[in-house]
Amino acid sequence: MQQDKVNLLGLNQKAIEDFFISIGEKKFHARQVFKWIHKKGVIDFDAMTDLGKNLRHKLKEKAQITIPKVVFSKASKDGTHKWLIDVGGSAVETVFILEEGRGTLCVSSQVGCTLNCSFCSTGKQGFNRNLSAAEVIAQLWIAARTLSKTDGEHDFTVTNIVMMGMGEPLMNFENVVPAMDIMMDDLAYGLSRRKVTLSTSGVVPRIYDLLEQSGVSLAVSLHAPNDMLRNEIVPINKKYNIDELLEACKLYAQKGPHKHITFEYTLMEEVNDNLSDAEELVALLKSREVPAKINLIPFNPYPGTPYKKPSNNRIHRFKEFLQHNGFVTTVRKTRGDDIDAACGQLAGDVMDKTNRKQRYLKKLGDTNAN
Protein backbone atom coordinates (compact mmCIF):
# COMPACT_ATOMS: atom_id res chain seq x y z
CA MET A 1 0.00 0.00 0.00
CA GLN A 2 1.43 3.35 -1.05
CA GLN A 3 1.97 5.77 1.81
CA ASP A 4 0.40 9.22 1.52
CA LYS A 5 2.84 11.95 0.67
CA VAL A 6 3.53 14.51 3.40
CA ASN A 7 2.50 18.08 2.58
CA LEU A 8 5.53 20.14 3.59
CA LEU A 9 3.64 23.44 3.39
CA GLY A 10 2.21 23.24 6.92
CA LEU A 11 5.32 21.97 8.72
CA ASN A 12 7.15 24.44 10.93
CA GLN A 13 10.94 24.34 10.98
CA LYS A 14 11.20 21.66 13.68
CA ALA A 15 8.57 19.46 12.02
CA ILE A 16 10.20 19.66 8.60
CA GLU A 17 13.59 18.85 10.16
CA ASP A 18 12.04 15.81 11.86
CA PHE A 19 10.59 14.71 8.52
CA PHE A 20 13.95 14.98 6.77
CA ILE A 21 15.62 12.95 9.54
CA SER A 22 12.89 10.30 9.15
CA ILE A 23 13.79 9.86 5.47
CA GLY A 24 17.52 9.73 6.19
CA GLU A 25 18.41 13.30 5.25
CA LYS A 26 20.16 16.10 7.13
CA LYS A 27 18.49 18.98 8.94
CA PHE A 28 20.18 21.64 6.84
CA HIS A 29 18.44 20.27 3.74
CA ALA A 30 15.13 20.70 5.56
CA ARG A 31 15.96 24.34 6.23
CA GLN A 32 16.86 24.82 2.56
CA VAL A 33 13.47 23.47 1.45
CA PHE A 34 11.64 25.45 4.16
CA LYS A 35 13.23 28.64 2.86
CA TRP A 36 12.43 27.79 -0.77
CA ILE A 37 8.76 27.30 0.08
CA HIS A 38 8.12 30.33 2.25
CA LYS A 39 10.84 32.88 1.59
CA LYS A 40 11.06 32.34 -2.17
CA GLY A 41 7.61 30.96 -2.91
CA VAL A 42 8.93 27.93 -4.82
CA ILE A 43 6.88 24.73 -4.62
CA ASP A 44 8.50 22.67 -7.41
CA PHE A 45 11.28 20.46 -6.04
CA ASP A 46 13.05 20.52 -9.41
CA ALA A 47 13.34 24.32 -9.15
CA MET A 48 15.18 24.10 -5.82
CA THR A 49 18.58 24.40 -7.43
CA ASP A 50 20.76 23.90 -4.34
CA LEU A 51 19.34 20.42 -3.70
CA GLY A 52 21.03 17.36 -5.16
CA LYS A 53 19.29 15.33 -7.86
CA ASN A 54 18.88 12.27 -5.62
CA LEU A 55 17.30 14.34 -2.84
CA ARG A 56 14.90 15.99 -5.25
CA HIS A 57 13.87 12.56 -6.53
CA LYS A 58 13.33 11.27 -2.99
CA LEU A 59 11.23 14.30 -2.08
CA LYS A 60 9.01 13.80 -5.11
CA GLU A 61 8.40 10.24 -3.95
CA LYS A 62 7.69 11.00 -0.29
CA ALA A 63 6.49 14.60 -0.09
CA GLN A 64 4.50 17.28 -1.83
CA ILE A 65 3.86 21.00 -1.51
CA THR A 66 0.17 21.54 -2.11
CA ILE A 67 -1.33 25.02 -2.32
CA PRO A 68 -5.14 25.35 -2.16
CA LYS A 69 -6.86 26.71 -5.25
CA VAL A 70 -7.96 30.35 -5.31
CA VAL A 71 -11.58 30.30 -6.49
CA PHE A 72 -11.62 34.04 -7.05
CA SER A 73 -10.04 37.23 -5.80
CA LYS A 74 -11.23 40.82 -5.61
CA ALA A 75 -9.50 44.16 -5.13
CA SER A 76 -11.23 47.15 -3.56
CA LYS A 77 -10.76 50.75 -4.56
CA ASP A 78 -9.16 51.40 -1.14
CA GLY A 79 -6.42 48.78 -1.67
CA THR A 80 -8.16 45.97 0.19
CA HIS A 81 -7.79 42.51 -1.39
CA LYS A 82 -9.96 39.47 -0.75
CA TRP A 83 -9.43 35.84 -1.74
CA LEU A 84 -11.92 32.96 -1.67
CA ILE A 85 -9.84 29.82 -1.21
CA ASP A 86 -10.98 26.26 -1.93
CA VAL A 87 -10.30 23.89 0.96
CA GLY A 88 -11.64 20.62 -0.35
CA GLY A 89 -15.19 21.46 -1.38
CA SER A 90 -15.63 24.25 1.14
CA ALA A 91 -14.22 27.75 1.07
CA VAL A 92 -12.59 30.24 3.41
CA GLU A 93 -11.88 33.90 2.91
CA THR A 94 -8.69 35.86 3.45
CA VAL A 95 -8.52 39.65 3.43
CA PHE A 96 -5.59 42.05 3.04
CA ILE A 97 -6.15 45.54 4.45
CA LEU A 98 -3.89 48.37 3.31
CA GLU A 99 -3.27 51.23 5.72
CA GLU A 100 -0.61 53.90 5.90
CA GLY A 101 2.64 52.25 6.90
CA ARG A 102 1.26 48.74 7.25
CA GLY A 103 -0.43 45.91 5.40
CA THR A 104 -2.53 43.57 7.52
CA LEU A 105 -3.64 40.11 6.45
CA CYS A 106 -6.77 38.74 8.13
CA VAL A 107 -6.45 34.93 8.22
CA SER A 108 -9.17 32.30 8.73
CA SER A 109 -8.73 29.30 11.02
CA GLN A 110 -11.92 27.27 10.51
CA VAL A 111 -14.55 26.58 7.87
CA GLY A 112 -17.42 28.28 9.62
CA CYS A 113 -17.35 28.64 13.40
CA THR A 114 -18.56 26.69 16.43
CA LEU A 115 -19.27 29.66 18.69
CA ASN A 116 -22.32 31.20 16.99
CA CYS A 117 -21.97 34.75 18.33
CA SER A 118 -25.35 36.33 17.70
CA PHE A 119 -24.11 39.27 15.64
CA CYS A 120 -21.48 37.48 13.51
CA SER A 121 -22.24 36.53 9.93
CA THR A 122 -19.65 33.73 9.90
CA GLY A 123 -21.43 31.97 12.74
CA LYS A 124 -24.60 31.75 10.65
CA GLN A 125 -22.79 29.29 8.36
CA GLY A 126 -22.53 26.71 11.10
CA PHE A 127 -19.32 24.75 11.55
CA ASN A 128 -17.73 22.44 8.98
CA ARG A 129 -14.19 21.67 10.16
CA ASN A 130 -10.86 23.01 11.35
CA LEU A 131 -8.31 24.09 8.78
CA SER A 132 -5.02 22.21 8.66
CA ALA A 133 -1.79 24.06 9.41
CA ALA A 134 -1.07 23.95 5.66
CA GLU A 135 -4.44 25.57 4.88
CA VAL A 136 -3.80 28.31 7.45
CA ILE A 137 -0.29 29.20 6.26
CA ALA A 138 -1.37 28.86 2.62
CA GLN A 139 -3.42 32.03 3.06
CA LEU A 140 -0.24 34.00 3.78
CA TRP A 141 1.68 32.17 1.02
CA ILE A 142 -1.02 33.06 -1.53
CA ALA A 143 -1.30 36.67 -0.38
CA ALA A 144 2.47 37.22 -0.38
CA ARG A 145 2.83 35.80 -3.89
CA THR A 146 -0.20 37.65 -5.28
CA LEU A 147 0.57 41.02 -3.75
CA SER A 148 4.18 40.94 -4.94
CA LYS A 149 2.85 40.94 -8.51
CA THR A 150 0.58 43.93 -7.99
CA ASP A 151 1.49 47.19 -9.73
CA GLY A 152 3.91 49.51 -7.99
CA GLU A 153 1.49 52.28 -7.03
CA HIS A 154 1.20 50.99 -3.45
CA ASP A 155 3.33 48.94 -1.08
CA PHE A 156 1.32 45.75 -0.67
CA THR A 157 3.77 44.03 1.69
CA VAL A 158 2.19 41.96 4.48
CA THR A 159 3.59 43.50 7.67
CA ASN A 160 1.00 42.24 10.17
CA ILE A 161 -1.12 39.14 10.62
CA VAL A 162 -4.42 39.02 12.49
CA MET A 163 -6.02 35.66 13.18
CA MET A 164 -9.44 37.29 12.96
CA GLY A 165 -10.94 35.69 9.87
CA MET A 166 -13.50 32.89 9.80
CA GLY A 167 -13.49 30.71 12.90
CA GLU A 168 -12.22 30.73 16.48
CA PRO A 169 -8.45 30.14 16.27
CA LEU A 170 -8.12 28.79 19.81
CA MET A 171 -10.59 26.03 18.92
CA ASN A 172 -8.03 24.94 16.30
CA PHE A 173 -4.98 25.37 18.51
CA GLU A 174 -3.00 22.36 17.21
CA ASN A 175 -2.97 23.71 13.65
CA VAL A 176 -2.94 27.47 14.24
CA VAL A 177 0.16 27.49 16.47
CA PRO A 178 2.45 25.69 13.96
CA ALA A 179 1.18 28.00 11.22
CA MET A 180 2.02 31.05 13.34
CA ASP A 181 5.46 29.53 14.03
CA ILE A 182 6.06 29.62 10.27
CA MET A 183 4.84 33.21 10.04
CA MET A 184 7.42 34.25 12.64
CA ASP A 185 10.34 32.15 11.38
CA ASP A 186 13.22 34.18 9.94
CA LEU A 187 13.67 31.57 7.21
CA ALA A 188 10.04 32.12 6.20
CA TYR A 189 8.12 35.39 6.67
CA GLY A 190 10.10 36.81 9.59
CA LEU A 191 7.28 38.55 11.44
CA SER A 192 7.76 39.36 15.13
CA ARG A 193 5.40 38.23 17.90
CA ARG A 194 4.23 41.82 18.15
CA LYS A 195 3.12 41.73 14.50
CA VAL A 196 1.08 38.53 14.76
CA THR A 197 -2.19 38.92 16.66
CA LEU A 198 -4.59 36.16 17.60
CA SER A 199 -8.16 37.17 18.33
CA THR A 200 -10.29 34.98 20.57
CA SER A 201 -13.84 35.11 21.85
CA GLY A 202 -12.58 33.76 25.15
CA VAL A 203 -11.46 30.12 25.15
CA VAL A 204 -9.80 30.69 28.51
CA PRO A 205 -7.70 27.51 28.99
CA ARG A 206 -6.18 27.95 25.56
CA ILE A 207 -5.18 31.55 26.35
CA TYR A 208 -2.81 30.15 28.98
CA ASP A 209 -1.56 27.55 26.48
CA LEU A 210 -1.00 30.27 23.89
CA LEU A 211 1.10 32.31 26.30
CA GLU A 212 3.27 29.28 27.05
CA GLN A 213 3.64 27.90 23.53
CA SER A 214 3.57 30.95 21.26
CA GLY A 215 3.21 34.30 23.00
CA VAL A 216 1.89 36.23 20.03
CA SER A 217 -0.12 39.40 20.57
CA LEU A 218 -3.60 38.81 21.99
CA ALA A 219 -6.90 40.44 21.14
CA VAL A 220 -10.15 39.52 22.89
CA SER A 221 -13.63 39.85 21.41
CA LEU A 222 -15.39 41.24 24.47
CA HIS A 223 -18.43 43.04 23.01
CA ALA A 224 -20.25 43.44 26.34
CA PRO A 225 -19.50 44.93 29.78
CA ASN A 226 -21.32 42.27 31.85
CA ASP A 227 -22.04 38.56 31.89
CA MET A 228 -25.77 38.90 31.33
CA LEU A 229 -25.39 40.63 27.96
CA ARG A 230 -22.29 38.67 26.95
CA ASN A 231 -24.06 35.37 27.62
CA GLU A 232 -26.64 36.46 25.07
CA ILE A 233 -24.38 37.71 22.27
CA VAL A 234 -21.18 35.66 22.89
CA PRO A 235 -22.45 32.25 24.09
CA ILE A 236 -19.02 30.89 25.08
CA ASN A 237 -19.28 33.31 28.02
CA LYS A 238 -21.63 30.78 29.65
CA LYS A 239 -18.65 28.41 29.86
CA TYR A 240 -15.88 30.93 30.59
CA ASN A 241 -17.28 34.09 32.17
CA ILE A 242 -15.83 37.58 32.13
CA ASP A 243 -14.02 37.19 35.47
CA GLU A 244 -12.19 34.07 34.22
CA LEU A 245 -11.44 35.72 30.90
CA LEU A 246 -10.01 38.90 32.41
CA GLU A 247 -7.88 36.93 34.87
CA ALA A 248 -6.24 35.18 31.91
CA CYS A 249 -5.87 38.50 30.09
CA LYS A 250 -4.17 40.11 33.08
CA LEU A 251 -1.49 37.40 33.14
CA TYR A 252 -1.08 37.57 29.36
CA ALA A 253 -0.51 41.32 29.53
CA GLN A 254 2.19 40.81 32.16
CA LYS A 255 4.11 38.19 30.17
CA GLY A 256 3.12 38.71 26.52
CA PRO A 257 4.79 40.84 23.83
CA HIS A 258 2.65 43.89 24.62
CA LYS A 259 1.92 45.30 28.04
CA HIS A 260 -1.77 45.55 27.23
CA ILE A 261 -4.60 43.50 25.76
CA THR A 262 -6.64 44.75 22.83
CA PHE A 263 -10.35 44.36 23.51
CA GLU A 264 -12.63 44.35 20.48
CA TYR A 265 -16.08 45.74 21.05
CA THR A 266 -18.64 45.60 18.25
CA LEU A 267 -21.06 48.49 18.70
CA MET A 268 -24.72 47.64 18.03
CA GLU A 269 -27.39 50.28 18.34
CA GLU A 270 -29.34 50.14 21.61
CA VAL A 271 -27.73 46.80 22.47
CA ASN A 272 -24.31 47.68 23.89
CA ASP A 273 -23.64 51.25 22.74
CA ASN A 274 -25.40 53.21 25.48
CA LEU A 275 -23.46 55.55 27.75
CA SER A 276 -24.33 53.26 30.65
CA ASP A 277 -22.57 50.42 28.78
CA ALA A 278 -19.46 52.58 28.40
CA GLU A 279 -19.54 53.42 32.10
CA GLU A 280 -19.86 49.74 33.00
CA LEU A 281 -17.02 48.80 30.63
CA VAL A 282 -14.69 51.36 32.22
CA ALA A 283 -15.57 50.16 35.72
CA LEU A 284 -15.04 46.54 34.70
CA LEU A 285 -11.58 46.98 33.19
CA LYS A 286 -10.38 49.29 35.95
CA SER A 287 -11.58 47.00 38.73
CA ARG A 288 -9.80 44.00 37.19
CA GLU A 289 -6.63 46.05 36.58
CA VAL A 290 -6.24 44.77 33.03
CA PRO A 291 -4.07 47.08 30.87
CA ALA A 292 -6.40 47.62 27.93
CA LYS A 293 -6.59 49.14 24.51
CA ILE A 294 -10.11 49.20 23.10
CA ASN A 295 -10.96 48.78 19.43
CA LEU A 296 -14.54 49.79 18.68
CA ILE A 297 -16.06 48.09 15.64
CA PRO A 298 -19.26 49.63 14.24
CA PHE A 299 -21.58 46.76 13.36
CA ASN A 300 -21.79 45.83 9.68
CA PRO A 301 -25.38 44.78 8.88
CA TYR A 302 -26.03 41.65 6.82
CA PRO A 303 -29.27 40.09 5.52
CA GLY A 304 -31.55 38.83 8.27
CA THR A 305 -29.72 40.36 11.23
CA PRO A 306 -31.78 42.13 13.90
CA TYR A 307 -28.86 44.42 14.81
CA LYS A 308 -28.16 47.90 13.50
CA LYS A 309 -25.08 50.06 13.13
CA PRO A 310 -25.11 52.98 15.58
CA SER A 311 -25.10 56.55 14.37
CA ASN A 312 -21.79 58.37 14.16
CA ASN A 313 -22.85 60.49 17.14
CA ARG A 314 -23.40 57.42 19.31
CA ILE A 315 -20.08 55.91 18.22
CA HIS A 316 -18.27 59.18 18.95
CA ARG A 317 -19.93 59.52 22.38
CA PHE A 318 -18.90 56.00 23.37
CA LYS A 319 -15.33 56.55 22.20
CA GLU A 320 -15.03 59.93 23.93
CA PHE A 321 -16.16 58.50 27.25
CA LEU A 322 -13.58 55.70 27.12
CA GLN A 323 -10.80 58.11 26.16
CA HIS A 324 -11.80 60.56 28.90
CA ASN A 325 -11.38 57.71 31.38
CA GLY A 326 -7.85 56.96 30.26
CA PHE A 327 -8.28 54.16 27.72
CA VAL A 328 -6.56 54.27 24.35
CA THR A 329 -9.54 53.81 22.04
CA THR A 330 -9.77 53.45 18.28
CA VAL A 331 -12.70 53.06 15.92
CA ARG A 332 -12.08 50.54 13.19
CA LYS A 333 -12.49 52.11 9.79
CA THR A 334 -14.68 50.26 7.33
CA ARG A 335 -12.51 48.98 4.50
CA GLY A 336 -13.27 46.74 1.56
CA ASP A 337 -17.03 47.00 2.03
CA ASP A 338 -17.46 47.30 -1.76
CA ILE A 339 -16.12 43.72 -2.03
CA ASP A 340 -17.83 42.34 1.13
CA ALA A 341 -14.48 42.27 2.95
CA ALA A 342 -15.30 44.60 5.82
CA CYS A 343 -15.25 43.20 9.34
CA GLY A 344 -18.28 40.99 9.87
CA GLN A 345 -18.88 40.32 6.19
CA LEU A 346 -16.56 37.34 5.80
CA ALA A 347 -19.46 34.96 5.25
CA GLY A 348 -20.64 36.91 2.22
CA ASP A 349 -24.40 36.78 1.73
CA VAL A 350 -25.87 34.91 4.68
CA MET A 351 -27.99 32.11 3.22
CA ASP A 352 -28.89 28.59 4.28
CA LYS A 353 -26.17 25.97 3.97
CA THR A 354 -27.63 24.29 0.87
CA ASN A 355 -27.79 27.49 -1.16
CA ARG A 356 -24.38 28.57 0.05
CA LYS A 357 -22.87 25.25 -1.03
CA GLN A 358 -24.56 25.47 -4.43
CA ARG A 359 -23.35 29.04 -4.90
CA TYR A 360 -19.79 28.05 -4.05
CA LEU A 361 -19.80 25.02 -6.36
CA LYS A 362 -21.17 27.17 -9.18
CA LYS A 363 -18.38 29.70 -8.65
CA LEU A 364 -15.81 26.89 -8.63
CA GLY A 365 -17.31 25.42 -11.80
CA ASP A 366 -17.32 28.78 -13.54
CA THR A 367 -13.68 29.29 -12.60
CA ASN A 368 -12.64 25.87 -13.90
CA ALA A 369 -14.47 26.50 -17.16
CA ASN A 370 -12.56 29.72 -17.83
Curated annotation (Swiss-Prot):
Organism taxonomic ancestry: Bacteria, Pseudomonadati, Pseudomonadota, Gammaproteobacteria, Thiotrichales
SUPFAM superfamilies: Radical SAM enzymes
Entry's Gene Ontology BP terms: rRNA base methylation; tRNA methylation
Main location: cytoplasm
Class of this enzyme: transferase
Disulfide bonds: 106-343
SMART domains with a match to the protein in the record: Elp3
Catalytic residues (positions): 93, 343
Necessary cofactors: [4Fe-4S] cluster
Keywords attached to this entry: 4Fe-4S, Cytoplasm, Disulfide bond, Iron, Iron-sulfur, Metal-binding, Methyltransferase, rRNA processing, S-adenosyl-L-methionine, Transferase, tRNA processing
GO molecular function (one): tRNA binding
Entry's cofactor comment: Binds 1 [4Fe-4S] cluster. The cluster is coordinated with 3 cysteines and an exchangeable S-adenosyl-L-methionine.
Similarity annotation: Belongs to the radical SAM superfamily. RlmN family.
Residues that coordinate or bind S-adenosyl-L-methionine: 167-168, 199, 221-223, 300
Domain of life: Bacteria
Radical SAM core domain span: 99-337
Gene that this polypeptide is encoded by: rlmN
One GO CC term on file: cytoplasm
Record Gene3D superfamilies: 1.10.150.530, Aldolase class I
Species per Swiss-Prot/TrEMBL record: Francisella tularensis subsp. tularensis (strain WY96-3418)
Remaining remarks: Reaction proceeds by a ping-pong mechanism involving intermediate methylation of a conserved cysteine residue.
Catalytic activity: adenosine(2503) in 23S rRNA + 2 reduced [2Fe-2S]-[ferredoxin] + 2 S-adenosyl-L-methionine = 2-methyladenosine(2503) in 23S rRNA + 5'-deoxyadenosine + L-methionine + 2 oxidized [2Fe-2S]-[ferredoxin] + S-adenosyl-L-homocysteine; adenosine(37) in tRNA + 2 reduced [2Fe-2S]-[ferredoxin] + 2 S-adenosyl-L-methionine = 2-methyladenosine(37) in tRNA + 5'-deoxyadenosine + L-methionine + 2 oxidized [2Fe-2S]-[ferredoxin] + S-adenosyl-L-homocysteine
Protein EC: 2.1.1.192
Protein name: Dual-specificity RNA methyltransferase RlmN
Function: Specifically methylates position 2 of adenine 2503 in 23S rRNA and position 2 of adenine 37 in tRNAs. m2A2503 modification seems to play a crucial role in the proofreading step occurring at the peptidyl transferase center and thus would serve to optimize ribosomal fidelity.
Subcellular location: Cytoplasm
Residues at which [4Fe-4S] cluster binds: 113, 117, 120
